[in-house]
Every structure is written in structure tokens, then in C-alpha cells.
Design a protein with these regions (language model features):
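Active-site-proximal segments of metal-dependent phosphoesterases and phosphodiesterases across multiple
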Residues: 190-213
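Short, solvent-exposed loop/turn segments at the edges of secondary structure
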Residues: 41-42, 252-254
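Active-site-proximal alpha/beta segments of enzymes that process anionic O-linked groups
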Residues: 4-192, 286-288, 293-301
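Active-site rim elements
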Residues: 58-63, 197-204, 242-244, 264-275, ...
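Metal-dependent active-site segment of extracytoplasmic phospho-/sulfohydrolases and closely related
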Residues: 19, 208-249, 281-285
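Short beta-strand segments
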Residues: 85-87, 176-183, 203, 230-235, ...
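Membrane-interface soluble catalytic domains
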Residues: 69-79, 91-100, 106, 218-224, ...
């Protein structure tokens, strides 16, 4: 999973740049996909669990209950998979024993005081700036995650690991890895070659994201574990450019979704099936049963009504359901269904 990667820009990058000409062969790319949520907070637990958040309970309880009853984890457990979750922010204090080998909710970590102090002072300095200076300043990102020893999601960090680690550990048992990478998330601070810069563009960071994914695929190939792997490349949600038209906010619901089954071989296929993340639980089951990506979503075709759940950032207590009969990029066709999920009214 890469963060904040819209399908439109990703398609533009991989279809026009020579370096990606064959990078995604063997995959089916579902370009007309709709995510269920527009933000990471709800999208990640939904993708992993198959359970929707409709504000029936506070988010902490929802996330724990959803993951404890994950249809995906249950399917993996039944097939004796070893499971690993790599995510900077996913804190799951689960009660059900799914034997997550590196469960971020139960792992002990060590605090690096110097890094913590640096991040804390950035916050304090900004908080107490005079208002006039505050208007001309901003803190794009506070990296409190750097203060502890845990998984780092940075594209550059992962790219270095994928390209410079000499060996990977192999096992005869079935393995599941969920990796949540930075992707095209703001700030737009990365060029096409993984260098951190100021005032970058979304296309630059999208190119870096594609390069990161390609390096991961090459790493699997080099170690002989590519062909027998199911690979799902996805984003938690898409991206809304600054100063975009009002309805462009709905571009956050059009993430990338590319899938490869076991021993699948063909040129990259672009599919315009009207897929929804609500279809993922069934797709997971079919992939685990050996289906190829070209055989997924067999009964899905236009016209189809798809639903999403929208809320404004930091106003998650008020959710509004939308539906559309159009393509993921036809934002003028989205309409409210009348369903509203308010936490305060439960």
C-alpha cells in the first residue's frame, strides 16, 4: 500500500516513461477503482478487515473490533500464513490472537530522547509564534515517529532497503506482508530519484512512488519469490491538489489498484471494470484460492452503482454516504444517498 496515490497521475507516469515500460507486466491495473474512504484513518483498517466504520462506536473501538474480526486475517490464519504488518501509525491492541509476528500494538519500543526533543521543540516554537509570523509559517510534518525504533514508511528509506540489502530471509511456510509506504503523501518533498527537495510536484512524487514499487517487484524476482507470490499494489486513497475545483475533492476516492496472481504471466493489462474497495474481501479469497487477476471481479460491469463514505478531515464524527453510476473520475455524477452516520447521535 502506498499513500495518497491517485490513479490518473500514476497511469500517466507508468504509461509515458520508458523506465516503467515492463515494470508492471503480469499485473492487471484496475484504473476505475473507487476506495471506500478518502482518508488513511478509516481506509487502512477497512482494507485489512473488510468491516466498515459507520460511526457506530468511537474510532478506537471500531478499529480494534474490525481487526479482531478481519475476514482477511481469518482467511490467512485458516491457511497457516505467517502474518506481518508494516505501518508507521497502525496501533492495534488486538485481543484475538492472529499471531501477527510484529504486532505494532504489542511491541516494546525504545524512545530516542534527542529526536523526541527536536520534534517537541518544533511544535512549541510554532505554537508560541506571534500571530503575524504564524501566518507566514507552517509545519508540514512532525516526525514523532522518528523518536522510536520502528518501521519507517519513507519512500527513500524503503527504496534503499529494497536495493541494498544483500539477502532476504526465506522460509518454506506461507507468508503475508502488509507494507504501508509513504507513496505520494504530502508534503511534496521528493523528486523522481528519491531525493528530498522543497517545492516538489505531485508528478515527481508519483514517479518516485512508481520507482519504489518497481524496486520491490525486482527484489522479489531477484530472490526467486516473485512468481509464487500474490501481489496487490494499492493506495489507501487518492489525492486532491491544492486550489482544485470543489468537486475535485472526490479524486481522493480513485486510488491505484494493481493485482498479480500466482504464476501469472502477461503484459500489463489495463481494466476499466468499475471496481470498489467493497469488492476486496471476495477478491482476497479468490486470490488465496489461486485465481489470476484477470479472473477477478467476474460479475462486475457497467452500469453499476458504487458507494463511498465521505467526511471532512478532522470532522470524522459526521459521515455522509455518496453513490455514483459513473466512472471514478466523473465527480459530477456523485450524489448523496441520504445516509448520514453521525457519531454524536448514536
Amino acid at each position: 500500500m502506498v499513500d495518497s496515490q491517485s490513479a490518473t497521475e500514476f497511469t500517466n507516469v507508468i504509461s509515458t516513461q520508458e523506465q516503467f515500460r515492463h515494470a508492471f507486466d503480469d499485473f492487471t491495473y484496475y484504473t476505475d477503482t473507487l476506495s471506500t474512504y478518502a482518508y488513511t484513518r478509516d481506509s487502512v483498517p477497512y482494507v485489512l478487515s473488510g468491516h466498515l466504520n459507520k460511526n457506530d462506536e468511537n474510532f478506537g473501538d471500531y478499529s480494534e473490533n474490525a481487526l479482531n474480526n478481519s475476514t482477511l486475517f481469518n482467511a490467512l490464519e485458516e491457511r497457516d500464513y505467517d502474518m506481518y504488518l508494516y505501518d508507521e501509525d497502525l496501533a492495534w491492541y488486538g485481543k484475538k490472537d492472529f499471531d501477527i509476528k510484529n504486532n505494532p500494538g504489542t511491541r516494546n519500543v525504545s524512545l530516542r530522547f534527542g529526536e523526541y526533543f527536536k520534534q517537541e521543540m518544533r511544535y512549541v516554537w510554532f505554537k508560541y509564534l506571534p500571530y503575524g509570523l504564524k501566518k507566514a509559517s507552517e509545519i508540514e510534518k512532525l516526525n514523532f515517529g522518528n523518536t522510536i525504533d520502528k518501521f519507517k514508511w519513507g519512500n527513500d528509506v524503503l527504496y534503499n532497503e529494497f536495493n541494498n540489502v544483500s539477502e532476504i530471509e526465506k522460509t518454506s511456510g506461507a507468508q503475508f506482508r502488509f507494507i504501508h509506504a509513504e507513496g505520494a503523501h504530502v508534503p511534496l518533498d521528493m523528486d523522481e530519484n528519491m531525493n528530498r527537495i522543497k517545492d516538489g510536484t505531485y508528478i515527481q512524487k508519483t514517479t518516485a512512488t512508481a520507482k519504489l514499487i518497481a524496486s520491490f517487484i525486482n527484489r522479489l524476482k531477484a530472490n526467486g519469490v516473485y512468481d509464487n507470490s500474490v501481489i496487490v499494489i494499492m493506495a489507501d486513497h487518492g489525492y486532491q491538489p491544492k486550489n482544485a475545483p470543489e468537486n475535485y475533492i472526490l479524486s481522493r476516492f480513485n486510488p491505484i489498484l494493481l493485482i498479480k496472481g500466482v504464476n501469472e504471466k502477461h503484459d500489463l493489462i489495463y481494466s476499466e471494470k468499475p471496481v470498489s474497495y467493497l469488492d476486496l474481501p471476495q477478491a482476497y479469497e479468490e486470490l488465496l484460492d489461486g485465481k489470476q487477476s484477470t479472473d477477478l471481479f467476474a460479475d462486475i460491469e457497467y452500469p453499476r452503482t458504487r458507494k463511498v463514505i465521505w467526511y471532512e478531515i478532522y470532522k470524522e464524527e459526521h459521515m455522509v454516504e455518496y453513490e455514483t453510476d459513473g466512472k471514478a473520475t466523473e465527480w459530477d455524477k456523485f450524489r448523496e444517498t441520504g445516509e448520514i452516520f453521525d457519531l454524536s447521535k448514536k
